[in-house]
Amino acid sequence: MTQQSGRIWVMGGRPLNGTAAIPAAKNSVLPLLAAALLCRGPVRLRAVPRLSDVECSLGLLRGAGCAAHWQGADIVVAGMPSNSTLPGETAAQMRASILFCAPLLARLGRAETSLPGGCNIGARPIDLHLEGLARMGAKELDAGAGKLVLAAPGGLHGTDFTLRFPLSLIHISEPTRLGMI
């Protein structure tokens, strides 16, 4: 193996083949759980890590009116969302709760919750998420301190949107991608 100009070259006499089990990661599971709000049929995610943010996500799904439960190491989510208000106490426990707003806007035309919370690793504003949703037709309604209320009475629509820096934020593009589905 050699490394040149930012690339890794693997040299050998045999082609690679076979399978590899890749464990699920929290930052890939959370957007998939939010995307389950967009699905008409049941969703099964396999080999999901049992983490507090995953448990919070299940609480948000249940708060939206979906059935969401563990089956061994899998999660099954069924039903369409019927409630646009997410449990504020649950949403305030994790940063990724913002991911659930776009699917609710797409399905119900409204999303209401508390501001996202989570770990204290520094300032992590949600302005870029809200900017993307606004470009797609969502409007932020005045809800008071600590609350977030979004409405898209005409539905969400596609748009051209360039994310401004910092692009390194976790989940920065997911709300807009989920809103486009």
Regions found by a protein language model. Give the residues of each.
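Short, recurring structural edge motifs at helix starts
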Residues: 19-22, 42, 47-48, 119-120, ...
